[in-house]
């Protein structure tokens, strides 16, 4: 059973700097809450309260919320409308997909004179004959019911038939109450038989499979049991056994210390080797938040982490990490990393003489009467003079 604690409320009030006394809106959906408590004492100024997708069985402890305008308790286990008379400012009430059979309980909302919208879709009472006419006539302050606007002619017609419709609905409620009592007994027997069947299964996976394959009815007890099984499944998934095999860690470096080339994210990329820099263009997903991208530029490799997936590329020459730049396109989302090389190839440029001799070309290469190859000047790449050191192939 999940309780509404101060820690939970503060966690959900980050938009208000975790101050709960001045809180005007809070969302406590999908928390498996079974009882509404403490909120009316801690958050007196609440205007919007969202409690959908929980296991709440009863509307209670809300009468002090005088400023509450919107209450959403859809997809819970509520069986009747009650204890909302003190919510004077309530203008919208959402009770979608609950188990409300007692339709006459909506008469408790007659004092909520600010109520304009009521949603009862997905409840058993919606199938009652003259359901809409009865609610429209009982709550004259409503403007819409089940997201459908109420017209003046519809309201007049419903008021004329109110007494007759109410007697029909009361009779239908009695039948539903009898059916509900029988359902409680029937579901209790089914749950007991299922528990005995699952207890005889030793394999945990087979036991879980047997539960989910069993036929069940649509009722509060089954919804609570399903939520409990979901919670147990999450706990089993989060709690790892010490006997479970650990996932092998991916090696990023060779035994000799050389970085590997990796592309776990399977991202297309381009890598250009220019004279004085490297240029890496990584095609990151266009709509990916930049906060999910981490770039680490080192002297011999660059590592880009995209949603915990690693892209790593090594280069043959060292770079200057402090002078490198990282940019991302606002149009395509691509990542561009400009890596300045530490040692740029030295180029020997022969200087041309300031004056040219009018002598013949074959005389320019002679010295002391010996022929010499003419040197016309140009660029010499010294990287080809010495052979590079033997390095193992990159992976």
From Swiss-Prot:
Entry coiled-coil feature ranges: 170-196
Main location: cytoplasm
LRR repeat residues: 20-44, 46-65, 66-89, 90-110
SMART domains found in the cross-reference section: LRR_SD22
GO cellular component terms, A-Z: cytoplasm; dendrite; motile cilium
Keywords tagged on the record: Cell projection, Cilium, Coiled coil, Cytoplasm, Flagellum, Leucine-rich repeat, Repeat
Record keyword NAD present: no
Disulphide connectivity of cysteines: none
Tissue: Expressed in chordotonal sense organs, Johnston's organ and sperm (at protein level). Expressed in ciliated cells. Expressed in the head and testis.
Chain ranges of the CS domain: 264-355
BP GO annotations: axoneme assembly; cilium-dependent cell motility; male courtship behavior, veined wing generated song production; outer dynein arm assembly; sensory perception of sound; temperature compensation of the circadian clock
Listed Pfam families: CS_DNAAF11_C, LRR_9
Subcellular location as annotated: Cytoplasm; Cell projection, Dendrite; Cell projection, Cilium, Flagellum
InterPro entries, per the entry: CS_DNAAF11_C (IPR056496), Leu-rich_rpt (IPR001611), LRR_dom_sf (IPR032675)
Domain LRRCT: 128-146
KO phenotype (gene knockout): Larvae mutants are insensitive to touch and have defects in larval locomotion. Adult mutants show defects in motility and coordination and are deaf; lack antenna oscillations and mechanical amplification of stimulus-induced antennal vibrations. Mutant males can mate but are sterile because of amotile sperm; tail axonemes lacked the inner dynein arms.
Origin superkingdom: Eukaryota
Family of this protein: Belongs to the tilB family.
Described purpose of this protein according to its UniProt entry: Cilium-specific protein required for cilia structures in Johnston's sensory organ. Plays a role in motility of cilia and flagella.
Name listed for the protein in its UniProt record: Protein tilB
Lineage: Eukaryota, Metazoa, Ecdysozoa, Arthropoda, Hexapoda
Gene symbol of the encoding locus: tilB
């Amino acid at each position: 059973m999940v309780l509404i604690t101060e820690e939970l409320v503060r966690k959900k009030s980050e938009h208000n700097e975790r101050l709960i006394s001045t809180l005007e809106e809070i969302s406590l959906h999908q928390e498996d809450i079974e009882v509404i408590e403490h909120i009316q004492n801690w958050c007196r100024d609440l205007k919007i309260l969202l409690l959908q997708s929980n296991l709440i069985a009863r509307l209670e402890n809300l009468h002090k919320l005088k400023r509450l305008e919107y209450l959403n308790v859809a997809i819970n286990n509520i069986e009747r409308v009650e204890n909302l008379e003190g919510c004077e400012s309530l203008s919208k009430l959402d009770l979608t997909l609950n188990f409300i059979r007692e339709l006459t309980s909506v008469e408790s909302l007659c004092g909520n004179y600010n109520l304009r919208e009521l949603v009862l879709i997905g409840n058993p009472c919606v199938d009652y004959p003259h359901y809409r006419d009865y609610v429209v006539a009982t709550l004259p302050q409503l403007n819409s019911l089940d997201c459908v606007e109420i017209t003046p002619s519809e309201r007049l017609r419903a008021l004329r038939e109110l007494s007759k419709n109410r007697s029909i609905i009361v009779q239908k409620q009695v039948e539903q109450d009898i059916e509900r009592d029988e359902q409680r007994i029937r579901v209790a027997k089914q749950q007991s038989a299922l528990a005995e069947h699952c207890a005889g299964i030793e394999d945990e996976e087979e036991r879980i499979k047997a539960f989910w394959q069993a036929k069940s009815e649509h009722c509060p007890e089954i919804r609570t049991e399903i939520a409990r099984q979901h919670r147990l499944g999450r706990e089993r998934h989060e709690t790892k056994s010490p006997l479970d095999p650990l996932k092998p860690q991916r090696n990023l470096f060779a035994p000799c210390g050389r970085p590997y080339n990796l592309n776990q994210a399977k991202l297309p990329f381009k890598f250009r080797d220019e004279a004085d820099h490297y240029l890496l263009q990584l095609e990151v997903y266009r709509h990916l938040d930049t906060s999910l991208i981490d770039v680490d530029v080192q002297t011999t490799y660059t590592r880009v982490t995209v949603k915990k997936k690693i892209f790593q590329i090594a280069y043959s020459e060292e770079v200057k990490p402090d002078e490198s730049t990282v940019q991302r396109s606002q149009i395509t989302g691509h990542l561009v990393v400009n890596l300045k090389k530490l040692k740029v190839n030295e180029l020997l440029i022969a200087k041309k003489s300031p004056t040219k001799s009018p002598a013949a070309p074959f005389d320019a290469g002679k010295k002391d009467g010996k022929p010499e190859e003419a040197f016309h000047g140009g660029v010499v790449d010294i990287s080809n003079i010495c052979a590079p050191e033997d390095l193992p192939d990159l992976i």
